[in-house]
Amino acid sequence: MENPLAEAPVPPVPQDVEPGGVRWLRANVARFSRPEDHARRRALVVAELTPMSALREKAFELTRESRDEPVERILRTVPVAVLAAELGLPDVSRDIATVSAAYHPHTETGPDAEKAMRRLIEGCGGDADERTAARIGLLVQACDATAKLVGKALEAHRPGEDAAGLLDRVLREDPPVRVTRRWINGAVVEVDLTERPFGAGPKRCPGQAHAMDVAKGILDVLLC
């Protein structure tokens, strides 16, 4: 049964911010948008995701090429590198990881994250607009969540279990994202996502299929 709180608005983030930094990213991505802005910004993300194809195969190839790297590095770089290539960007995984650590409103920003944001905006064409925010936000959203999902899958793997079945089980039993935050009657409320790991309602993750394909491609290599 869906939790009606999942459809409530997210906690507000400051809107009057200087363009180009982490706070600007928060103020312009669908993830933290006000209801009146959310549908438009989510559509920008969907437009970037729609042309992507063969992500499982591409993640497989990149993971195979990186097989001698530490697993933790593979998990942190391959998802971002695959999606960045689909967006026509170079491997920006290092900068995305830096921004990801400061992305959520309850975390602190810092000079490293601000510098990374400037490089990412420049890599996206230099315009600090909603499309650029959508592209960077897409990669940030993929960074930690996909790494955690694949990491949990590697820990939980049972002999003979294939990537698809393993991921389905992990999402049921030990999802990487267990709670989200919503704004109810002027207060922040945590909403349980255990039974809906990709969210619910209008804020459901638009990249679920893409994340699963990338995760499967990585596991196809690492489980061998």
Question: What is the predicted role of each segment?
Answer:
Residues 190-216:
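Cytochrome P450 heme-binding Cys-pocket and its upstream "meander" loop
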Residues 80-140:
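Cytochrome P450 catalytic core segment centered on helix I
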Residues 135-137, 142-153, 179-180, 185-196:
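Conserved active-site beta-strand-loop modules that form the wall/rim of enzyme catalytic pockets
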Residues 134-135, 142-164, 206-224:
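Cytochrome P450 catalytic-core helices
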Residues 1-73, 84-89:
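Active-site substrate-recognition loop segments, prototypically the cytochrome P450 B′-helix/B-C loop
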Residues 20, 28, 131-133, 137, ...:
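Long, low-complexity intrinsically disordered regions
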Residues 45, 79-80, 142, 170, ...:
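A residue-level signal for conserved active-site and pocket-lining positions in enzyme catalytic cores
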Residues 126, 160-192:
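Conserved cytochrome P450 K-helix E-x-x-R motif and the immediately C-terminal K′/meander segment
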